[in-house]
Amino acid sequence: MAGNFWQSSHHQQWILDKQDLIRERQHDLKNLTEEEYQKIFMFFANVIQVLGEQLKLRQQVIATATVYFKRFYARNSLKCIDPLLLAPTCILLASKVEEFGVISNSRLITTCQTVIKNKFSYAYQQEFPYRTNHILECEFYLLENLDCCLIVYQPYRPLLQLIQDIGQEDQLLTLTWRLINDSLRTDVSLLYPPYQIAIGCLQIACVILQKELKAWFAELNVDMEKVQEIARAILNVFELWKSYDEKEIQGLLEKMPKPKPAPQR
């Protein structure tokens, strides 16, 4: 994506302070523990990923949709909009912004119905309840809350540059790319610039693959303390995954703060 990250709205408005993030969540954490809250977001990141794959979207589009989703709830309670409505809305908006091409409304709704029924029936007993008018209305609300800051810089491009600098390492690239996908289940996209996320994921991949690149990392002009924080956040989500049980998701969704039903017209 063209443009300079440092002059972008992503850098200037959407690299958030961790304390602000924690404070904004307090309303939801009256109903949920921190771990339960994180598991709900892992679940919806999975929903966005599967919807995106079914719609044959590029990973960049799926990642942007996930960041929109996380940004919305960084400033709003889960009770503001049902996450099951916001997830496909984020996909619709991301596909436009990333110039993937238009997803027809009917195809989006049909895909949501199929995915919820076939892949996530453990969480939802009912069929997907929303229609095109709900998604279009939700899109206006999402745009307003994102303050129309729609360009999202992802760690994939910095990763390709880093790998090129190291020397073509296919195995390292593949694993780090997957770790960047995993990082979407954490808060790092809200807290750190994408190049730091790429380096944090690369560092984990080097440990897993037993690649000795300490000297190369030492030459990087980067705040290694921040990189370590990113690596810890990703390793923490792996720990959380160990206790992530599909059977408990329905109970967590029932416990989650809910939007008030709209008044009958």
From Swiss-Prot:
GO terms for cellular component: nucleus. One of its GO terms (molecular function) is cyclin-dependent protein serine/threonine kinase regulator activity. Keywords: Activator, Cyclin, Nucleus, Repressor, Transcription, Transcription regulation. It is found in: Nucleus. Its main location: nucleus. InterPro entries: Cyclin-like_dom, Cyclin-like_sf, Cyclin/Ssn8, Cyclin_C_2, Cyclin_N. Residues 48-151 form the Cyclin N-terminal domain. One of its GO terms (biological process) is regulation of transcription by RNA polymerase II. The keyword Transcription regulation applies. Belongs to the cyclin family. Cyclin C subfamily. Component of the Mediator complex, a coactivator involved in regulated gene transcription of nearly all RNA polymerase II-dependent genes. Mediator functions as a bridge to convey information from gene-specific regulatory proteins to the basal RNA polymerase II transcription machinery. Mediator is recruited to promoters by direct interactions with regulatory proteins and serves as a scaffold for the assembly of a functional preinitiation complex with RNA polymerase II and the general transcription factors. Component of the Cdk8 module of the Mediator complex. This is Cyclin-C. The gene is CycC.
